[in-house]
Amino acid sequence: MENKWILNSGNSPKHPEFRLFCFPYSGGSASYYSGWNQLFGDNIEILPIQYPGHETRADEPLIPDVRALAEAALEGIVPDTDMPFGFFGHSLGALVAFETAALFTEYELDLPQMVFLSSAGTNFDRVQPPVHTLSGEALKKT
């Protein structure tokens, strides 16, 4: 049975030793990672995550909540965690990857060996207000 959460790029290694689930950025899609299998050799299989409302799943409604998206993705990911695995997420994908990894802990599932997060901000307080809220004069002074 085909997994709608995983984009099959058709160039996966035959006998991988590790699986890397890749979560795309907001507005992105799983096909962004379709060429990555060629970059990582025969030991690592890249499994791009396809969100509802994107590309091959464009007819499905978007899931606007990160936690709900992680919960839904978890169901699609778990069947392919039968070997060592990790997560990579970029931007919004970093948030979804982090939340999904947290769910593995919450549900006492085998944990990813690695979680790579790129270009995602933290929840720290800003020192100054965001520039889009500044008046023209205040913006000139920054």
Predicted regions and their residues:
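Domain-scale detector for complete catalytic domains at protein termini or as standalone homologs
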Residues: 1-88, 92-142
